[in-house]
Amino acid sequence: MVREIDCNELTELLELYLHLHENTVPDTTEILNNAWNTIVQDKNHHIIVNEVNGKIVSSCVCVIIPNLTRDVRPYAFIENVVTHKDYRGKGYATQCLNYAKEIAIKENCYKMMLLTGSKDDKTLSFYNHAGYNSADKTAFIQWLE
């Protein structure tokens, strides 16, 4: 079942992120709790999860960003697309991305964007099949310490 995350599911989400790029679940600190509270209280920040048999197996984040161009239409940014390694290839992440697209359409976004650090052909093909292309824009990243 695809849905938005409940505020009491932080631990499950952090455990899923171990299948993204994290090595450990962060300690519960005031900084973590403040960040989580900010996220769940932000009407433009959507953490989408796919639950199978009571377990969160896939997720993505969809942030709606207000904009002053394109007829003052917002755009959506997708981040942290992840599926538990034991559940990959079953369409769960695609369902999360489709849910994000529904949110973006409802919010009148004119585009959706995502970045991936992966160069793996399977990952790139996944995003292409989900409707994203890598031809229209060039992304630049500046990592901050």
List each model region and its residues.
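A short beta-loop-alpha structural element at the N-terminal edge
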Residues: 1-13
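A short helix-loop-beta-strand connector motif used in the catalytic cores of GNAT acetyltransferases and
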Residues: 37-49, 77
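Conserved glycine-rich acetyl-CoA-binding loop
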Residues: 71, 84-95, 107, 119-124
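Conserved beta-strand in the GNAT
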Residues: 49, 55-64, 82
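Conserved GNAT-fold acetyl-CoA-binding loop/helix
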Residues: 14-36
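Conserved acetyl-CoA-binding loop-helix of GNAT-fold acetyltransferases
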Residues: 80-83, 89-102, 129
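Conserved beta-strand-loop-alpha-helix junction that forms the acyl-donor binding cleft
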Residues: 113-123, 141-145
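Conserved GNAT acetyl-CoA-binding A-motif
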Residues: 97, 104-116
